[in-house]
């Protein structure tokens, strides 16, 4: 809990593939055209050399937006993100907004506190643009008939559905067995839960 364990060799994750302020980094850039309805109308990929002029924390970016004094590029980014978010909401997706927990250690090295990190729109901005870029990459690979690995989300087993039904019953919610299970169904169930604590528990169930 008190350290980061990188998935890649540290020379890649902390240096070569890390966007550091004031340093050039080779990259593949995804150019997206997004219309007023939040639909990605076209995309293209190019090789690029990226230089980060200034690193900014999620909390700082959110504070600038909330205060109304964010630079123009950040305001434009937020405006386009709102279009993407509205289009995504219209598709009625299953959105598991799971809280991130941080384990705080005391001076003796023992767990002193487990804190929930607040999720900000700034986090969602980055996530939604990453998803849009990933979708564009998938379409580009499919268009080339490239051999790729697909991630398939299997439907929940009957045992898991029964467990979920029993859990929802504790919140006076019903899940009828035998109906067609879709992401939209789970989204509707979560949307109907107004209590934030219960909603978070439902997402993790």
Predicted regions and their residues:
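Conserved, carboxylate-rich catalytic/transport cores that coordinate ions
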Residues: 1-205
């Amino acid at each position: 809990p008190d350290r980061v364990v990188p998935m890649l060799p540290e020379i890649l994750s902390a240096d070569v593939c890390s966007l550091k302020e004031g340093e050039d980094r080779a990259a593949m850039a995804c150019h997206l055209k997004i219309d007023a309805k939040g639909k990605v109308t076209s995309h293209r990929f190019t090789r690029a050399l990226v230089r980060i002029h200034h690193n900014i924390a999620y909390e700082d970016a959110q504070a600038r937006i909330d205060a109304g004094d964010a630079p123009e590029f950040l305001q434009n980014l937020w405006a386009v993100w709102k279009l993407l978010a509205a289009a995504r909401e219209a598709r009625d997706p299953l959105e598991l907004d799971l809280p991130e927990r941080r384990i705080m250690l005391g001076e003796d090295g023992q767990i002193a506190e487990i804190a929930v990190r607040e999720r900000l729109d700034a986090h969602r901005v980055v996530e939604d643009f990453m998803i849009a870029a990933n979708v564009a990459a998938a379409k580009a690979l499919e268009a080339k008939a490239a051999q790729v690995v697909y991630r398939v989300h299997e439907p929940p087993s009957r045992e898991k559905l029964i467990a979920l039904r029993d859990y929802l019953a504790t919140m006076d919610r019903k899940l009828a067995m035998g109906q067609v299970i879709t992401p939209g169904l789970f989204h509707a169930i979560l949307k109907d839960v107004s209590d934030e604590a219960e909603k978070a528990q439902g997402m993790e169930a």
